Amino acid sequence: MKEKKTVFKLFFVWDFEKEELWLNEMAQEGWVLDNTGFSFYTFVRCEPGEYIIRLEMNPSSDYRAFVKELGAEYIGGCVNWVYFRRKAELGSFELLSDIDSRLTHLSRIDRMLSLICLANLILGITNSLNQARCGWLNLLCAAMLSYALGRIHGMKAALEKERSLHE
């Protein structure tokens, strides 16, 4: 039986690049991602640097099949995120290889967060007006999601600026 370990580590939605970097650092140390849950990561022992890990938000089943054709293995998902791993010996493994694909990825995150933020804002205001005690919780969630949206918008603006420099 392979040696396993589970690690609890919290990443915010705008930290997906840091999460991916950490997962690849773990693979470099000989621990490859085998399963994931909300902030829980299960790793199995591997050869250091044997795998490259990538994550993507809410890809279609066609996209998942395409990634599989590239030689990657679907590890699993958590909420709207899916995780892939591929043997490093197969060469470079980039899912978001250009500015346009990165902007599209950030736009998907933006749409999801916007809908959840709007729902929490509406529920928070409605519950506050009806003197429900949970209204403040929805408003707090809306505020946190607004912060996340600001971070995502900042990332998109930086990419747009980078694209304009290359044109």
Task: Set out the residue ranges of the language-model regions.
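Terminus-proximal functional modules
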Residues: M1-E167
